[in-house]
């Protein structure tokens, strides 16, 4: 970590929160580039795999777990940049989620983003986080971003400082 040497070439869906962190820390240009990379991971198979070897551009963990991180980063970048491409990114991701994960009774994980084979499970964070970030991305006036902070489960807490 302190040498700057690359120790791996895997990027996963759980790492996709980091563009938002970079943007909130003021490094918007790096955040933009990393979000573009995360979105390329999404578009490679039409939905985000759990992990990808970005050197080989091959999926190393093919499941899709309905995670919020990439949508959260799009929302944060949309706020800080007002660039409409993040809303468009969100529209594509939402459309893909509905297309591939919708069931008669809700949504489900995918066993494989390559084959689009559906699982039989819906994580609670789909409702608590993923869909909430989509809503906020598409309707930013619903919440004053600068007057709240989000806890780890995407619950907005009013800032008093």
Question: What is each PLM-predicted segment?
Answer:
Residues 1-161:
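Glycan-recognition and catalytic cores of secretory/periplasmic carbohydrate-active enzymes
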């Amino acid at each position: 970590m302190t040498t700057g040497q690359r120790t791996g070439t895997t990027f996963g869906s759980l790492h996709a929160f980091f563009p938002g962190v970079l943007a909130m820390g003021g490094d918007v240009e790096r955040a933009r580039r990393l979000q573009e990379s995360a979105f390329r991971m999404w578009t490679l198979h039409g939905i985000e795999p759990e992990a990808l070897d970005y050197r080989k551009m091959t999926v190393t963990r093919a499941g899709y777990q309905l995670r919020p991180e990439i949508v959260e980063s799009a929302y944060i970048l949309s706020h800080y940049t007002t660039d409409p491409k993040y809303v468009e990114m969100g529209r594509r991701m939402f459309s893909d989620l509905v297309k591939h994960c919708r069931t008669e009774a809700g949504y489900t994980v995918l066993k494989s983003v390559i084959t689009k084979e559906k699982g039989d499970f819906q994580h609670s964070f789909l409702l608590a986080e993923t869909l909430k970030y989509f809503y906020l991305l598409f309707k930013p006036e619903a919440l004053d971003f600068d007057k709240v902070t989000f806890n780890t489960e995407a619950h907005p807490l009013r800032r008093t400082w």
